[in-house]
Amino acid sequence: MSGNAVIESLETRRAVRSYADRPVEREKLEAILEAATYAPTGMGAQSPVIVLVESKETRDKVAALNAGAMGRDTDPFYGAPAVAIVFGHKDVVPTWFEDACLVAGNLLNAAHAVGVDSCFIYRAKEVFETDEGRALLKEWGLDGDYVGVANCILGYGDGPSRNPGKTGT
């Protein structure tokens, strides 16, 4: 359906795995996070929570925990300056996981719509099951049964995407 801006945006978004050392503008981050909250949720509960990590120290700490969960000594966030971590709360609605995934999807698509590159990074659950991860949750004021669902890295790509997109459909 050529000519439809929403469809074109969905079809042209790519995962970016190399980032320039350049912060994302505040107004773009706010627009991305706001759009993410418009995802549909079970029973309209709107229970997922997003924590935006921009501090290099905290970002590097979460990246190290993620790399440890992966069993590699690498930066799983590919140098991205910001990470939006999406959490679901197990006690609010039975669809907490699906709801958090929809929020992450909205977040990634909103980033593309405002010209910010992104990538979905796994292992949020494993990171926030560790003692260090639970300490971060407490520091961020997230008490209760919050589960990490998605790390959405945000920034500006350092070069063209290597991912050509979907073919053969």
Regions found by a protein language model. Name each.
Residues M1-T169:
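Acidic, surface-exposed loops and disordered segments
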